Amino acid sequence: MLKQRTIKSIVKTVGIGVHSGRKVELTLRPAAPDTGIVFSRVDLPTPVDIPASALSIGDTRLASVLQKDGVRVSTVEHLMSACAGLGIDNLYVDVTAEEIPIMDGSAATFVFLIQSAGIEEQNAAKKFIKVTKPVEIRDGDKFARLDPYFGFRLKFTIDFRHPAVDKTGQELEVDFANTSYVREIARARTFGFAHEVEMMRELGLARGGSMDNAIVLDEYRILNNDGLRYDDEFVKHKMLDAIGDLYVIGHPLLASYTAYKSGHGLNNALLRELLAHEQAYEIVTFDDPKTAPTGFGFDAQTAFA
């Protein structure tokens, strides 16, 4: 059967919160089958566990934020994206602040952490959410949509009207049957505009943001000396975010995702819309890995790029 996965050993790192600017310690621990991805605020007098769930996402203005009983874990999308890309089903994520550290602004550090911990299969069938009917959410000209598809395919279009972004391509389509997440998506960094960063700092946000963890643009160009990691890094980062946003549903999706100018809020609304229509999806497993969609096998997802 196609099996669930966790990590083999505990791994730790330290980074800063992009909004708080404070030091955050992050520990990843193995978890038993059917645990899911569980975030734990270990800095509180009594630690609070918040399982990743589409219905636990609260604030989505600047990041995807998990909330439970007034306790928050913010900016979970890059770590969730790495878990999705490597096929990690079960994991404990201990964090000493209300923000997952931003690291380099991509998912690459989290991929490295998980790979260095080692990935192991567990004696339980991997569960997928198979979309059986189209589901769509619109907000003005923005939209996000899921269609039935035997695999996981994404098509994302951005529209930033900026000279540097225009040159790099605003549309990307990826099918993970023939694309390596680690090689093609994981290293794409978040990006922001210098004038927005200044405004956010005045509001007490983005205190940890810098060119070490983001692509920063002025009105005309990219300010980072080292340029871009991918020719189309902007749209690739939006896809990286979407993969993480969608993975909070708790299982990998078998679906085709199409989006235009979507963000954390619209992605979460799409998951809620799917879950509200029980006839639009089913939970499936694969007793024979050969019958599963290409790209979800252990070697396909966990090979070092």
UniProtKB/Swiss-Prot annotation:
Needed cofactors: Zn(2+)
Family annotation (SUPFAM superfamilies): Ribosomal protein S5 domain 2-like (SSF54211)
Catalytic reactions on record: a UDP-3-O-[(3R)-3-hydroxyacyl]-N-acetyl-alpha-D-glucosamine + H2O = a UDP-3-O-[(3R)-3-hydroxyacyl]-alpha-D-glucosamine + acetate
GO molecular-function term, one example from the UniProt record: metal ion binding
EC numbers, comma separated: 3.5.1.108
GO biological process, one term: lipid A biosynthetic process
GO cellular component annotations of the record: membrane
NCBIfam families for this protein: lpxC
Stated name of the protein: UDP-3-O-acyl-N-acetylglucosamine deacetylase
Native species: Burkholderia pseudomallei (strain K96243)
